[in-house]
Amino acid sequence: MGNELQHRTVLLDEAVESLVTRPDGIYVDGTFGRGGHSRAVLARLAPGGRLIAFDKDPRAIETAQGIEDARFSIVHDSFASMRDALAARGVEKVSGVLLDLGVSSPQVDDPARGFSFRADGPLDMRMDPTRGESAAEWLARASVQELTEVIRDYGEERFAFQIAKALVARRAESDRLGPLDTTGELAQIVGHVVKTREKGKDPATRTFQAIRIHVNQELADLQVVLDAALSLLEQGGRLVVISFHSLEDRIVKRFMQAHASAPAVDRRLPIRAVDLPSPPLKIISRQFPSEAEVAANPRARSAVMRIAERVTP
């Protein structure tokens, strides 16, 4: 219960105000979490409105099942399954899609989930602990090259190769030391390699982020759900995405810009601008948490919210 109370939804009012443009529409919350955005969306919907939420985390599903509202339903799956899941429910078009990316405070603050380097726990990091390969299982088999690529590309860590070598060297000692299966030991290994210090950031931050992204296929799933959202949005429907690190935000920014721009055409060709297809999206805005919100919830500091609207049928 304590963890539930600690979670604060970032950009709550701003996101829901941007999302809900038609109170009787069908909306999707791709990341239910602990339900902050979903409850606020339901409060704005008319009796004929509908909200379908997604989450991989079994604890999020438990929380969602406590919402007694006929307009609401929850899907225990990744938002990457959105297109098929909505089709199975007879939904062809929606009025808005909300994505609040990253991990929630209850996930980070629970050592048993293995997301945090601040408290020792099992090295898991899966959003859904019942499916897929845990961080410990992946670390037990990954090559130096694969480890380097993941830590470099998903953590933007300049010491990726050195960290990868240290992890493989530790694995060679498994017969004597046992498997590398705790967050505390992983953080310690990284700390011994990363000698430089970024102000206010633990040396293990980038490596933990990278492994979490890899284990959960976060960036691949994000690209899938953005494509799905574009095809599902009705004319006038909104796509609202809140991201918390540069890799996510870069993907969202490029996606929105690509679909809000007219297609490139060779100027030497006899094609008029009016003959080109209209881009499907219009970028509405980019927003950041207020100083007051960041003061109340420091984890909101890195949040960026991007909003786009479908302008073509």
Curated annotation (Swiss-Prot):
A GO CC annotation recorded here is: cytoplasm
Q: What keywords were assigned to this record?
A: Cytoplasm, Methyltransferase, rRNA processing, S-adenosyl-L-methionine, Transferase
Reaction(s) catalyzed by this protein?
cytidine(1402) in 16S rRNA + S-adenosyl-L-methionine = N(4)-methylcytidine(1402) in 16S rRNA + S-adenosyl-L-homocysteine + H(+)
Amino acids binding S-adenosyl-L-methionine: G35, G36, H37, D55, F79, D100, Q107
Q: What is its EC number?
A: 2.1.1.199
InterPro entries recorded: RsmH, SAM-dep_MeTrfase_MraW_recog, SAM-dependent_MTases_sf
Give a yes or no for keyword S-adenosyl-L-methionine in this entry.
Answer: yes
Q: Does the keyword Glycoprotein apply?
A: no
Any single biological process term in GO: rRNA base methylation
Q: Name one GO molecular function term.
A: rRNA (cytosine-N4-)-methyltransferase activity
Question: Where can this protein be found?
Answer: Cytoplasm
Cite the HAMAP family for this sequence. Answer: 16SrRNA_methyltr_H
Q: Cross-referenced PANTHER family, in alphabetical order?
A: 12S RRNA N4-METHYLCYTIDINE METHYLTRANSFERASE, S-ADENOSYL-METHYLTRANSFERASE MRAW
Protein role: Specifically methylates the N4 position of cytidine in position 1402 (C1402) of 16S rRNA.
Protein name, as recorded? Ribosomal RNA small subunit methyltransferase H
Instruction: Tell me which species this is from.
Output: Burkholderia lata (strain ATCC 17760 / DSM 23089 / LMG 22485 / NCIMB 9086 / R18194 / 383)
